[in-house]
Amino acid sequence: MNNKIGFTLLFLFGFVLGLILLTNDARAQQPASGSKPAQPSATAQNPEGPYTITSSIEFGVRGIAIDGNADIYRSQLNYTPGFRIFDASLFMQSKDNDAPVFDSLMISSFGWGNDPNRHLRVNAEKTKAYRFDANYRRFDYFNSLTNIALGQHRSNTEYRQGDFDLTILPQNQRAKFYLGYSLNRNSGPAVSTIRFNGDEYPAAYPVRAASDEYRVGADARVSVFDISFMQGWRFFKDDTEYLITVPHPGNNPTNTAKINDFFRSAPTRGETPFTRLSVHTLINRRLDFTGRYIYTSGTTRYTFFQNGTGTDSSNNKVNSDIITQNGGSKRPYGMGDVAATFFVTDRFRISETFRVNNFRINGADLLSEVLLRSRVTAGGETTLPPVLTNTLAFRTIKYRRFLNLIEADLDISRWLSVHAGYRYTDRHVEVGFDDISIGTPAGPEVETFDNRTNTFIFGFKAKPVKIWSLYFDLERGESDNVFTRVDNYDFTNVRVRSILRPNRTLSFNASVVTKDNANPSVTEDNRAFGVNVKGRVFTSSVDWSPSQKWSASGGYTHSRVTSDAEIILAFSGSPSTPGQSRYFSRDNFFFVNGFCQLSSRAQLFAGYRFHKDPGQGNRLSTQKLLIGSFKYESQAPEAKFVLKVNKNVDWIAGYQYVAYQEQFPKGDFYRAHLPYTSLRISFGRPE
């Protein structure tokens, strides 16, 4: 109730303030009787300073009223009530490109205050000297959804990301230089689960992760070659911990395991230097050649410490269970490719690309565990023999992949062009692993895997009539996956797109995308054990802009995904039996937007969005067939009114409504009302 009263008062305050400003502006436009016409000021006629400046700021309040599950609302939208700066911008342009520090400066931002997404952008340039580009973003990530994890996987963290790039001599065609820096931070409270003594327990999970990247590079023109070089260094760290400070019986109430306290820490450090070199040239306007080489060498190190006390599943008292671990890995990676395009004629082109990927991952760690337990009986407490574990583990992955792609493009006429190609890959993978218990002989094992894929590509662009464009793309073949060594994916991807423009104000867009993906595999007992996924996306939209005073657009998208996986069903007391798991997604999305210039001072924007996924429909699971889907429905109408109070001030009032409903017997829902009002103050904009 307090939230509803609060946002209502704030909304009325903004409305009244806008009317007051409108009244004052109307009075100011009425000349006093007998007064002389105002003379133009000298400042307006002869503006001083080296820059032309345009700026604006929009500030106001947002109200929130939520009915239903507030955690789902925060996990999806996370807007909060109160004051905020919706957006702000500043643009400075030198009048003669001869300003002392910069010739142009643009600063823009939105969302600062209480919005979950905030962005700041800065662009500055001094002609022929430098160009600076900066982007800084902050995201509030809240996740607290009802799921099979009993609501014990939650987070309320903040992401901070930034990219800062400086280009020296940006207009110089012979040489230019680059400096860059990027940051990524994630921190905040979270809850996760841990396994201990045969049961599962919720644990505090404070997230602390960060990465920094530094870059330096140059572009140069040497004779007929364009050369580009980049050297970078990326550093990463993660200091996330798991904490349990109060006793907990565990999620399984049928066993005797419980925990008294628990601590886990695994600080991780990583660094990845990377190098990129590329060369490009055009020979006699017939042969376009590009060569590129990338090399990285990533290193990761970590230390692990864990200790917990409680009771295990055998009703033994766990006095201490200390696990320490130290390890690291290294991943040198190299990728080189060369590509050439030969212009046989003005209408016919042949392209050839050859690429080599090669990497190796070497890692090892040493694990030590000391488990101290005792048994409490009627006769007292008996100390059990300690359990000591010392294991040394090694892992090695070697990966090499060749790729060759040949393509041809033919422009048959102004109305028709055709594209065809063939892609071939050859992959070799070696996996080595060795787990050594201290005091026992080693038994290293190595697995080797080789495979090849073939893919055919075809497409065309047609213009049957002047107002109609038609696009078609087809890919059919096999695809490998570096982390899946069972078999190739058999896939067929088709895309058709149509654009119809009867005139300059009206356009119709329609497209169809189909993706058939099969991952066949056979286990050692000759049992089929694969996955088939079929996806279909139908999209259509209409855009109509008959004049600058009003416009409308709308569209409909239907996305359907069906997956069919062979699985093994294991029931307590019964032998494992083969089964199937099928998942259905049938998402329908509709939207409509409109704009109307009500008068020279007033504008109205309105829109409506609707989502519905009926999922599996009336299909039901059987003993050997598991059927799943996620049924939901959501709608979001919104409207915004903009009133130009005077040359420098706009009053804005808007309203958004979001309704979300999960279509389950006990499905969660929420309904959110989000009114807002704001003032936009501008300087330097035209009448």
Question: Language model features by range: what are they?
Answer:
Residues M1-L12:
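Bacterial N-terminal signal peptides that target proteins for export
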Residues L10-I20:
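Bacterial N-terminal signal peptides
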